[in-house]
Amino acid sequence: MTARWSGDWARPRVDGTAPAVDVLVPTVGRSAELATTLAGLAAQVDVDLRLVLSDQSADGDAASRPAVAAMLRVLEAQGRPVTLLTHHERLGLAEHRHFLLDHASAPTVLFLDDDVWLEPGSVRRMLDALRTLDCGFVGSAVQGLSYLADRRPHETAVFEPWSDGVEPEVVRRGTPAHDRWSLHNAANLAHVASDLGVEHGGWVPYRVAWVGACVLYDRERLESVGGFRFWPELPPEHAGEDVVAQWRVMERFGGAGIVPSGAVHLESPTTVTDRRVDAPDVVFR
């Protein structure tokens, strides 16, 4: 259901419609960042959503941290279903995403990293875009706002809107499409948005190499290309698992980013410290 306002928080909960979006959040050892992420999620008051949180922290107790627990209570008071999972065995990022996807039931799934704050209205814009474009996924690439004064025209020159609908395409390392990765550095999308002058509340779809940290998929289409079932091909220490899934979806159904992006990267140190194995190099070799 859409969020109940504070005047209704103490009223008995009433089962509403099935959520339009399952928000899938993997987390490990990041209580402050996770609380900020959940605060941004609670601000998405205009969309039916359910939270599925999977904790791989050593104690499996992220939900008990005061700030995290407070934000979970807000979501529940708003009438949002919350599912808390622990997943102690560390078999890698792809396996953890596979585990989360197995617990999803909504027609769309938002994979949201635990270090991303969302501007109010972000999920609604993504959902509107996914439905309008009828493609496999729509992403809101994260922006580091410490870079707002750092304009990088050499990195944004590859920006290319989808003007006549989203089409399937093949992206691989070494193709021209792969060069789009630079769009998502620093605060590049904020600069692109300001140059475009998008109408308030609107969005413009554009071509991507891939989108990290905040991606809304059509669940059926993601699962039809295998989802993250490729995880056994990878060692536990890897990166780029989301790239594999997105490239497969793009080949069949197309995918897009949208600008403006309301996703803000918290710029905390990464928890993925060993990136020697890049999943696309293994899966697409």
Residue spans for each PLM region:
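N-proximal low-complexity "stem/linker" segments adjacent to membrane-targeting elements
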Residues: 1-43
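C-terminal catalytic/acceptor-binding lobe
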Residues: 2-7, 16, 36, 203-220, ...
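Acidic donor-binding segment of Leloir-type glycosyltransferases
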Residues: 40-85
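Glycine-rich, basic loop-to-helix element that forms the pyrophosphate-binding segment
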Residues: 87-104
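A recurrent flexible, glycine/aromatic-enriched loop bordering the glycosyltransferase active site
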Residues: 94, 170-191, 197-217
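Short aromatic/hydrophobic "clamp" motif used to bind/position activated sugar donors
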Residues: 109
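The conserved acidic donor/metal-binding loop of glycosyltransferases
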Residues: 113-117
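Conserved donor NDP-sugar-binding/catalytic core segment of glycosyltransferases
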Residues: 121-182
